[in-house]
Structures are given as C-alpha cells and as structure tokens.
Amino acid sequence: MSLIPSFTLGKPALLFELSIGKNKLSFDPLIRFALDGKPWSFVFWWRYKVLTEGKFRLHVGAHPAINFRTIPVSINNETRDIQQVCRYLATEVAPSIMISKNFSLGMYYLYSRGLEEDATKTTHFVTVNGSISQIKITKDVFLKVAPPQLFYLMLDNEDGFFSNATLTLTKQNCPFSVSSVLNKSITANISSSKSFVWNISLLYSFNQKYLRRG
C-alpha cells in the first residue's frame, strides 16, 4: 500500500524503510519493489522535528520521489511492456497533541507536484487521526491501534473522502511484527482509487545506532 492508503500495487511487494538522522533532522528513504523485482516507487524523505517537547509536537518534511508504472508500447509491430518513470516533488506538515501517555491526536497534510506531462499535476492529502500506543494482550505481546482516521484526497480535479484504520501486533524483544491496513471510501469520484483496499504486512525492524568519533 502506498503513502496514500487509497492506492496499492495490487500484488505482493517488498518495502525497505530506513531512517538516518542527528538531533532533529533525518533522512528517511522508502524503497518499494514488486516481488518480481520490478521497482514500484523510490521516496527520499527529509524530515525535521520542529517541536519535540511538551504536549504539542510538530514535524515538517519534503521529498523528491520516483514512481514506476508499466505501460504497453509498440516496437517493430510488437506490443511490449516497458517501465515508465514519473517524478514528483512533495512536502508535508504533521502537528499532533499528546492527550495522555498512550494516546495522541493529530493531523497530516501532504502536497505533491507531478513533473511529467501525463502524471497527476497536483495532489492534496489531508488526514485527521489518532494513535493508541500500546494495548497489552499478554505479558510480552502488544497491539498498537491507530483509530479510524478520516482523510480527504484531491488529485487534480478529482477528489473524495475516505476512512482508514491500522492494527499492528508486536512481541517484546522480537524484531518481527504483523500489521494490517484497511481503507474504505466514503464518497469519491477518483477514477484510479478503489472502494475498499486492505493489506497485511510482515515487518522486520532493526535498530542500529552509530557514533561519530573525532
């Protein structure tokens, strides 16, 4: 599933997420491939945490991105599939407020600009969301719940309202977790979106810290 939950590759995919940073600035690349080896998208986020103390939090970010899509072309009277590259530039703003130790409310806004002639020129993506940090199921198994979020999506002259929820099951001291995202349209006239989209993911997380010496 993509950053905007209404869209999906439609088949199994492999995702690589990395975060490299110091203090408030981080570089967060997100690389996606289909399991047949074809690239799906490369997103190169730069993020800055403006406010990190107190109840109110704020981060901003920007990225260049490359999306790949397969299109048929005619070569020497033969139809072949080729990979077309679409380039995008985007920026994000994400304020949130901590209601309690394990619960927060926030919103998220993303603006994207397509650079190709046949790509979506402008994208507006706005969400209102909440997060419950941990629900203890057993001694070392926890469920993280993102309560249903509402979001508005506008792609050029098409738009719609959607709802979305995320569940993540984790085990203490285990690098593997299982996550599922469910997305349902409320009212939409976006031709490329689907009425209902869901996925299930197996996640592997590693935490490696490096110290700069000298």
What are these regions (language model features)?
Residues 20-24, 134-138, 169-173:
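A generic beta-sheet turn/junction motif
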Residues 26, 55-57, 104, 142, ...:
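Membrane-spanning beta-strand positions in outer-membrane beta-barrel proteins
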Residues 68, 140-181, 189-191, 201-203, ...:
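Outer membrane beta-barrel transmembrane domains
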